[in-house]
Swiss-Prot record:
Gene name tied to this protein: rplI
Its biological purpose: Binds to the 23S rRNA.
Organism field: Listeria welshimeri serovar 6b (strain ATCC 35897 / DSM 20650 / CCUG 15529 / CIP 8149 / NCTC 11857 / SLCC 5334 / V8)
A Gene Ontology molecular function term of the record: rRNA binding
UniProt record, GO biological process: translation
Keywords, comma-separated and alphabetical: Ribonucleoprotein, Ribosomal protein, RNA-binding, rRNA-binding
GO (cellular component) term, any one: ribosome
Organism classification: Bacteria, Bacillati, Bacillota, Bacilli, Bacillales
Entry-linked Gene3D superfamilies: Ribosomal protein L9, C-terminal domain, Ribosomal protein L9, N-terminal domain
UniProt record similarity statement: Belongs to the bacterial ribosomal protein bL9 family.
Keyword rRNA-binding annotated: yes
Protein name (Swiss-Prot/TrEMBL): Large ribosomal subunit protein bL9
Amino acid sequence: MKVIFLKDVKGKGKKGETKNVADGYANNFLIKNGYAVEASNAALSTLSAQKKKEDKLAAEELAEAKALKEKMEKLTVELKAKSGEGGRLFGSITSKQIAQTLEKTHGIKIDKRKMDLPEAIRALGHTKVPVKLHHEVTATLDVHVSEE
């Protein structure tokens, strides 16, 4: 029997996949438990429409991320902090502070976890911070830390 998987089934198929399986397995396990539906013409057309919709949505997200990247790479986030001798900061600048300042000054809301800052900024000056906007798009944000 030909079925369309609604969920991932280990060893048999992934969500959205169409596959031939034994009749008993399809009726007694997959369809009964909601893991699959029988592959009729109506179900296949619904599946193709759903895939087109998902592809369109993914393309829109990618375009949005690319536009945001262009905008972000032109910006400089200005932060002020107290510092001692040699430009060393008292404390540090974290990705959370960068995200808050970015939202406050430029109106761009970015999750702090998307900023790839392995260690907090502990010195005055310019720092390039990579920001993962999409799994294919990474922007580089310029952060300038000046003395308070």
